[in-house]
């Protein structure tokens, strides 16, 4: 169960970073 939770948190962190990256790209393109 601990490993599952760790994977879940890692996935959330990855999604957050990806979202921020997309935002930065949009701002730079503007």
Swiss-Prot record:
Induction: Constitutively expressed, increases slightly as cells get older. Does not respond to acid, rifampicin, tetracycline or Ni(2+) stress. Antisense RNA expression decreases strongly under oxidative stress (H2O2 or paraquat), while aapA1 expression decreases only marginally in H2O2 but decreases strongly in response to paraquat. A decrease in antisense RNA leads to an increase in toxin production. One of its GO terms (biological process) is regulation of cell shape. It is found in: Cell inner membrane. This is Toxic protein AapA1. It comes from Helicobacter pylori (strain ATCC 700392 / 26695) (Campylobacter pylori). Belongs to the AapA toxin family. Its main location: membrane. Changing residue 14 to A: Reduced toxicity. Disulfide bonds: none annotated. Keywords: Cell inner membrane, Cell membrane, Cell shape, Lipid-binding, Membrane, Stress response, Toxin-antitoxin system. Changing residue 16 to A: Reduced toxicity. Addition of an SPA-tag or GFP to the C-terminus of the protein renders it non-toxic, but detectable by antibodies. The gene is aapA1. Transcription of the aapA1 gene generates a full-length transcript whose folding impedes translation. Processing of the 3' end of the aapA1 message generates a shorter transcript that becomes translatable after a structural rearrangement. The processing also makes it more susceptible to forming dsRNA with IsoA1 which leads to duplex RNA degradation by RNase 3 (rnc). GO terms for cellular component: plasma membrane. One of its GO terms (molecular function) is lipid binding. Has 3 regions; the N-terminal 8 residues are disordered and not required for toxicity, the central helical segment (residues 9-28) probably crosses the membrane, and the charged C-terminal 2 residues which are required for toxicity. May be involved in response to oxidative stress. Toxic component of a type I toxin-antitoxin (TA) system. When overexpression is induced in situ in the absence of its cognate antisense RNA antitoxin IsoA1 it leads to cell growth arrest and cell death without lysis. Neutralized by IsoA1 RNA which forms an extensive duplex with the mRNA. Binds artificial prokaryotic and eukaryotic lipid membranes, with 30-fold higher affinity for prokaryotic membranes. Molecular dynamics suggests the peptide penetrates the membrane leading to lipid reorganization and thinning of the bilayer.
């Amino acid at each position: 169960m601990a490993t599952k939770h760790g994977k879940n948190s890692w996935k959330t962190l990855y999604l957050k970073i990806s979202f921020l990256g997309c935002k930065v790209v949009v701002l730079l393109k503007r």
